[in-house]
Structures are given as C-alpha cells and as structure tokens.
Swiss-Prot record:
Residue ranges of the region described as Uridylyltransferase: 1-342
NCBIfam families listed in its UniProt record: PRK00275.1, UTase_glnD
InterPro entries, sorted: ACT-like_dom_sf (IPR045865), ACT_dom (IPR002912), HD/PDEase_dom (IPR003607), HD_domain (IPR006674), NT_sf (IPR043519), PII_UdlTrfase/GS_AdlTrfase (IPR013546), Polymerase_NTP_transf_dom (IPR002934), UTase/UR (IPR010043)
Protein name, UniProt field: Bifunctional uridylyltransferase/uridylyl-removing enzyme
Keyword Repeat: yes
Function: Modifies, by uridylylation and deuridylylation, the PII regulatory proteins (GlnB and homologs), in response to the nitrogen status of the cell that GlnD senses through the glutamine level. Under low glutamine levels, catalyzes the conversion of the PII proteins and UTP to PII-UMP and PPi, while under higher glutamine levels, GlnD hydrolyzes PII-UMP to PII and UMP (deuridylylation). Thus, controls uridylylation state and activity of the PII proteins, and plays an important role in the regulation of nitrogen assimilation and metabolism.
Length: 900
C-alpha cells in the first residue's frame, strides 16, 4: 500500500477542511467522491489493478482513521478498529464490503457504547457502507469456534486504529492450538467449496457467471490461501510457491488470472454503481469495450471477451484442483499409509489415486499421457490423479505434437478410451481440465471456452460437447431410460457405440470458424478417422452424422410430419435404419446438452413420430412411397370402424367427411378423426363452438395437450383463438387449420403450459381452458386483449431484427411464411392480429422457441384461399411483422438485416 498519495488523499488538506466546518460530514463526502473519481480514472487509463485495489484500501484506512479520531478514545483504551475479510487482506473494489471488527478487551461494552454508536452513525452519514461487529477477544474466540465464516474473516485482519496488542491476542486465542485444526478447517472449506460450486451448476461456463463465487472464480483462489494460512501461516501466492505447492509458472498463471478477474470485478462495480459480482448480459458489452476487446461488431467483441474469461476461470479451476488435491494428500494423509500398489511399469495406485512411478514417465514414454486416462476408465475404482502427476501432465503436454498425434500407440489409446464401458465422459472431462484434449485435438482446443452469445446455447462449445457425451452415457441408466425410452433402447443396441461418442465429440467442432459448422466439422471428422485408421464404414457413419446432426431436429420442428412427402424426403437423406438409429440418439442428446429447458414433451413426441414414420418408409422401400389416396382410405376405414362400434350411423359419418377434404385425413390419425367426428355429430346445430381437449399420448414424458375447435369459419378465427390462448397462459407448439366445404373450421392446436409440460389430468384447468376459448369464439367482436407482459431483461440483450421469408410452396397451393424473431410475450397473438389486418387465412403452422428466439413457419393463403402473388402485399406484410415484433435492443447492438 502507498505511504503517501496526495492525489488520492491529502491528509493535511483534509485536516484543514475539517477545521473549517462545523460538521465533518461534507469534508468526508467530498474526499470519498474525489477518491472514487481518481481511482476510476486510473482504472480507465490502465493502471495496475493490484495497485488500484490496494490504493482503495489505503484510502479507506485513512478515512476510517480520521473518522475514529473524531471521538474521545484514550490512548490506552482497550478498544481497536480492525479490518477483517477482504478489506483485512488490503483488497477493496469500488463497492466491496468494508468489514470491520470493533475489538474490545472486555465483554463489558457499556463504557464505549455511546462512542461506538456515534462512530458507526458517522460512517453511515458519510456514505460508507460497512459491515461491522463489536466483540471482545473472548467473544471472538467463542464465535470463531462455532462459525467457519467468522474464523475465516478473523484470519485476515489488520489493525486500523487502536492498540495492535488486542488483535494479536485475538489471533492467539483463535489459532489452531485452540480451535479449527488444519484438518478440520480443510474439510470444512472443501465442503463449502463443493456446495458453492453446486449453487452455480458445477460449471465455469454459466451464461452470466459470478466472478467471485462461480467455479474458477476469485473465491477459489481465496479458498486455497485460507487453507494454506491455516496450515502454514502463508497468505499469498508467492509464499505458497515457496512451500512447494506451486511451481513458478503456475504461480505466474494464477496471479495473472487473479488480476484479470480483478479487472472484470472492478469494471462491474464501476459500471453498476454498486456491489455486483454477476457478469450480467447488461454489462458484458461495456466491460468488453472497457477492457479493450475488439471484434467485427459488438457481438464478436463480447464473445472474444467471454472466451478469455472462460479460459481464465478454467485455468484457475485446473490449478485449484491441483492444489486442493495436494492439500488433501498432505493434510489428510493417514499415519499408517499403505505402500503404493503397482499398476504397470509407468503407474501405481497410491491411497486410491493413480500416480506416475517417477518424474520422467511422460518425458520418456509420452503415450502415457493418454494411457493414464484409459487406465482410469478401465478401473473405475481409481478415485483420481495425484497432485504431482497432474503437475507432470501439465508440464509435459507440450510433447503432444504432430508426431505424437500420428503415433499409432496414441491413436490406438485414444480410440480405446471410447470403447470403455464406463468413464468416457469423466475422463474426457479430465483430459480437457488438464489441457490434454485440446493439445491432442487442436480443433477441439479452438472451441475451448467459446461461448455463443445467445440464450439458446447456455454452455461453451466444449462444455456442450462433453455434456452431450455425458447424456449419451446416461441413457444406459434406468432412471434416465424412463424419460428417454426410445433413445435408451436404441443406444443399447447400437452395433458400435464408440462411433456415436466420436460423432458427438466432432458434431460442433466446426463452430467459431466462418462457414457451415456441420460441413467444417465433417471435414475435421474425416481427417480424424483417417489418422486413427478407422474402418471405412465407421468413418463414413461418423462423417455423415456430423454433417447431418441438425437435420432430424430441423425436420421434426419445422416440417409437417403428416405430409408423406416430408417423411419420404427425410428417409432419402437417412437411407438406412442404422443411420436413423444413430441420428435419433445423437439428436436427443444434442438437444438436452444444449439447454435442458429446450427438451419438452412435444419435442419428444415429434422426434419419436419422425423416427417411427421414417423407419416405416425405409422398411417399405424408398421406391415405394406412401400413396396419398391409400393413406386416406386407411385412415377413414379405421376411424369408421371406431365410430360404428360407438353407435354412429355410417351415413351420417360419410356425409360429414364429404365436407372435410383430403388434407384433414392426411393430417390426423384415425383415432383423432373418430374423436372429432363423434363429438361433431353429437353437437346441436346451434350449440356454438365445439372445444375438445385431450392429451396426445399416454407416455409420461412425451406429447402435449391437443385442443380441437370446430366452429363456423370467421375471418378473425385464428387471431381470436391465439389471443385467448395467450390469456390462458398456453404456449402453442403446433397448429393445423382446416376449413370444410360447409365453411366450418376444424383447428387443432398442440399446447403446453408455461413450464413446457402438457396440461395433464387437471379437470379444473381443462374446464377453464374450454370455457375461456368458447367464450372468446362466441363473442369474437370482443377481441381478447393481448396481455402486456414486460420483456424479460435477458431478451433485450439479444435483440435482432425479425427475419421474414415469404415463398410459395411448390407442392401445395399455399404461401410459406418463415419467421425468425426475438421471443416476446404474446408473439403469436400479435401475428394473429397481423394476419387479420391483411385478410389472410392460416392453413398450418409449426412453432419452435429456441432460447431467446422463435423460429416459426406459417402456411397461409389470401381471402380467396389462394397463395399470395402480389409482391407489394408481401413487402407490406414483412414490414408489419418486423415493426410489430422488434424488441428494443441495447444501445450499440446492431439489428440484423431483413432477409427476403
């Protein structure tokens, strides 16, 4: 800390200003304001961050000393003002907690009560937000013995004013000789760290990470230093290196990583104007600019900044693992430790952990850097890697070069890992953690820490990739197979499961490079297969899966699966059942590893339907596509059988069906046709709108709630319906609109609740939905008001111009309107209003929400049920949608251009 810094705080000038004023408050406030301006200016000019946070602590020391002097403490008074916690370390960010201990010799506080209260009031009046406690030395001991946080804070202390002897006595009575021996302290701190990591999802890669508390954050460094202080009396990184827990390169990396996070935290506090440790979207762009990250636009500068952030916290996490493991081996070492058990000539088992048998293992036999992970996968009883061996891996990973990558011993070992029955994900994660995976596969190293700046992808590309492999592995667990029955069944029967793991490893590896990441990844995957000498069939399957890993989800969510041509086209891409099985399992795991909230019961049922229909098409043969007329006949025959058995007159059924048209029977199953027809035939002529509600499947984790509406057609039918559903808090995922020749509309909607689940067996909720829709459709002139909900904070930071593409379908007389837009409350209701304004009829719709954006497809016609043909009308329609759906973006974020 500086001894003198008159620009930051001039003691003489401050004392003079105090003497001129009746009240000291104005002088203190002025000094605090000026100091903040000086320090912020120094930060913006690039001043050393360590010096900055120490300077701020020095300034606060001076202010507190001057405030303390305002009261009558005798020189030999048994009371001291002590800084504890982060402030006790001499580190203060702009709005960090200023933790104070007013330390007394005696538990009798009365003699000082009035002065203490007036002192704390003064601090409040001058704008210092402090956390304070008033304790005697004995009370400190009592509190510290019972509370891990208290003992931790007291370990980091400095006397600001008053006699130093009180603090020394406090340190003595709270030393390891009296409480919290280093073993107990270590176990408690390790448990505390695990709980904290779990709070932040056990990942460094949260979209809005906490720079202090998230894994790899500042608190992990502090945990290391706290344990070291309790064990060795050491409280800085350099001293820790001196104890042999860090080599010089690790010390330098940890110090530079800490300084980077200090810069981020300082900028966060400065921009937020308050204590803020969450790296919110609100601040990411400003901090990226403040710290000098540049890109083609705001989005790429944010992604560059966040990639640097993630790589820094990954480094901290790696070193934290190493040092905590080192502490465990030293502090928890049993007195009667068993001798190490040899595994082979290179490795041995030491207290349950694998370790190199000598320091030259990796230098003399570099292939052992892959072998160690294969051994752990083959012997799952191994708890992990000894600290010294982790360090040896880090020190020797530079030996992984092109010669290493092409060595058949290494390529064979890497493939062997993927053939292991268990431990694939765990050991790939270790390889990534220790920096081995990115060295062995440079293309993987490129995606480490790479964040895509959206709400759809909630993990970095490398974390998502490893999560996908984890999900593939979990499909073998009973509790997971219940939620993903088909995927689990198929995973168990894949002829070579290692191939889907390898395809998963490469499916997104092309991201971050210009071009189609599927095509780029396929090229990388092919090179990998050649280098690892995989058989031709295996290689072709892996490359095909990488190249086509998105096609199944895209088809299921954006195409009409009731259309035989859609199934035929998809089957033509897949070509055989083996590819279909692999692709289905990969798709399910990809969606769940991208963002768990994306997986819902309706997506599950769509993928199952596409899988089942495609399997039938492949078994039938692509040269024998489904005949539309034959499909209609089969549907009608099966439905008629159900209806007749239910007591319906076949003639009445035939008369109703003659009005419905072919599309109706192509889009609905025989069971649904029978359900609809039976209800329509029972409906009185003047009974008003008919609203039917049921679940689409009996499978627990699949399907949605189907709402069928039969009513006289009216111009505003779709607009009224979706507005009413919006008011009922229903999310529409599929819409099928049929108009009969008798001018009745038969609309089917698949809906989920706001949690992404079907309505289920909830009679009260079903009754409310039915009554709400019936009332809205009975009185369409009372057009339901679109609910004005606030656009969520996060969505505002991913605003982009809605993209609208309008084209005519070559196979059907409809116009296809494809919409990609920022999600917002009431979006479909707004679209319905626009269709009403432009006199358009909706024939079908596919609805998909992907994070912060929706990707919807609407099949529409004009008032004469014809495709749109007027270019000017299309242009005005596009403009209206863009204007209605644009979410106000953050300043400086450019909107994406409209594409026609």
């Amino acid at each position: 800390m500086p001894q003198v810094d008159p620009e930051l705080f001039d003691r003489g000038q401050f004392q003079a200003e105090l003497a001129l004023k009746a009240s000291p408050i104005a002088a203190f406030k002025k000094a605090i304001r000026q100091a903040r301006e000086v320090l912020d200016g120094r930060f913006r000019s690039g001043r050393d961050i360590r010096r900055l946070i120490e300077d701020r602590a020095w300034f606060v020391d001076n202010i507190l000393q001057k405030a303390w002097e305002q009261f009558s403490w005798s020189e030999d008074a048994d009371i001291a003002l002590v800084a504890v916690g982060g402030y006790g370390r001499g580190e203060l960010h702009p709005y960090s907690d200023i933790d104070l201990l007013i330390l007394l010799d005696s538990a009798d506080h009365e003699i000082f009560r009035d002065s203490i209260e007036r002192f704390l009031t003064l601090l409040w009046d001058i704008g210092l937000e402090v956390g304070q406690s008033v304790r005697s030395v004995d009370e400190c001991a009592e509190e510290a013995r019972a509370d891990l946080t208290v003992i931790t804070n007291l370990m980091e202390s400095r006397t600001i004013a008053g006699p130093e002897r009180l603090r020394q006595r406090m340190l003595e009575v709270t030393s390891t000789a009296h409480m919290w021996p280093s073993k107990d302290f270590f176990l408690a701190k390790r448990a505390e760290q695990k709980a904290r990591h779990h709070k932040y999802n056990d990942t460094e890669y949260n979209l809005e990470p906490n720079v202090k508390g998230s894994p790899g954050g500042l608190r992990d460094i502090q945990t290391i230093l706290w344990v070291a202080r309790r064990q060795y009396g050491t409280l800085n990184l350099r001293a820790l290196a001196g104890e042999g827990f860090l080599v010089e390169s690790e010390n330098a990396l940890l110090a530079s990583s800490q300084e980077f996070l200090w810069k981020v935290r300082y900028a966060l506090h400065m921009l937020a104007g308050r204590s803020e440790d969450r790296l919110l979207f609100d601040h990411q762009r400003s901090i990226a600019t403040l710290l000098g990250f540049e890109g083609e636009d705001a989005k790429t500068s944010i992604e560059s900044f966040m990639q640097q952030y993630y790589r820094v916290v990954m480094s901290i996490a790696q070193l934290s693992d190493l040092i905590i493991q080192h502490f465990e081996e030293v502090i928890l070492a049993p007195e009667d430790e068993a001798p190490p058990q040899p595994i082979n000539s290179r490795f041995q088992l030491h207290d349950g952990y694998i370790e190199a048998r000598n320091d030259n293992v990796f230098r003399r036999t570099p292939f052992a850097m892959l072998e160690i992970f294969v051994l752990m996968a083959q012997q799952p009883e191994i708890k992990g890697v000894r600290a010294d061996t982790i360090r040896l891996l880090r020190e020797n990973r530079h030996l992984i070069d092109d010669d290493f990558r092409n060595d058949i011993r290494n390529t064979s070992l890497f493939i062997e890992l993927f053939k292991c029955k268990i431990g694939i994900h765990r050991n790939l994660r270790r390889m990534n953690r220790y920096g081995i995976l990115g060295r062995y596969l440079p293309e993987f190293g490129f995606i480490v820490g790479q964040m895509q700046h959206d709400l759809f992808h909630i993990y970095t590309v490398d974390a998502h990739t490893l999560n996908l492999i984890k999900h593939l592995r979990k499909l073998q667990y009973t509790q997971v197979s219940e939620k993903f029955p088909l995927a689990s069944k198929l995973m168990a029967k894949l002829p070579k499961p290692e191939l889907i793991y390898l395809a998963g490893l490469y499916h997104d590896i092309g991201k971050g490079r210009h071009g189609d990441h599927s095509e780029i990844g396929a090229v990388d995957a092919e090179a990998f297969c050649q280098r690892h000498q995989l058989p031709l069939w295996d290689s072709r399957l892996i490359v095909w899966l990488v190249q086509n890993h998105l096609v199944m989800s895209t088809t299921a969510q954006r195409k009409d699966l009731s259309d035989p041509q859609v199934i035929h086209d998809f089957a033509g891409i897949v070509e055989d059942e083996t590819r279909l099985d692999y692709l289905y399992v990969l798709t399910v795991s990809d969606i769940n590893a991208t963002n768990p909230t994306l997986w819902n019961s309706w997506r599950a049922s769509l993928l199952r339907q596409l899988y089942t229909e495609t399997k039938r098409a492949l078994r039938r043969g692509l040269e024998n596509p489904v005949d539309r007329e034959e499909q209609i006949r089969r549907t009608q025959s099966a439905a008629l059988d159900i209806l007749v058995r239910g007591g319906n007159d076949p003639d009445d059924v035939e008369q109703l069906w003659s009005q419905l048209g072919d599309d109706y029977f192509l889009r609905h199953t025989a069971g649904d046709v029978a359900w609809h027809s039976d209800a329509i035939l029972q409906q009185p002529a003047d009974g008003g709108p008919l609203v039917l509600i049921k679940e689409t499947t009996q499978r627990e984790f699949e399907g949605g709630t189907q709402i069928f509406i039969y009513a006289p057609d009216q111009h505003d039918f779709f607009a009224v319906t979706v507005a009413a559903m919006d008011q009922l808090n229903l999310n529409i995922h599929d819409a099928r609109v049929i108009t009969s020749s008798s001018q009745f509309t038969l609309d089917t909607y698949i809906v989920l609740d706001t949690e992404g689940e079907s309505i289920g067996d909830n009679p009260v909720r079903v009754k409310k939905i039915r009554e709400g829709l019936t009332e809205a459709l009975r009185n369409p002139d009372d057009y339901p008001t679109i609910i004005q909900r606030r656009v969520p904070r996060q969505l505002k930071h991913f605003a982009f111009a809605p993209q609208v593409t309008i084209s005519n379908d070559a196979q059907r007389p409809v116009t296809v309107l494809e919409l990609s837009a920022p999600d917002r409350p009431g979006l479909l209701a707004r679209i319905g209003g626009i269709f009403l304004e432009f006199d358009l009829s909706l024939q079908n719709a596919k609805i998909a929400t992907l994070g912060e954006r929706v990707e919807d497809v609407f099949f529409i016609t004009d008032a004469d049920n014809q495709p749109l043909s007027d270019p000017e009308l299309c242009r005005r329609l596009q403009d209206a949608i863009v204007q209605q759906l644009s979410v106000t973006q953050e300043p400086g974020v450019e909107l994406t251009r409209l594409t026609i």
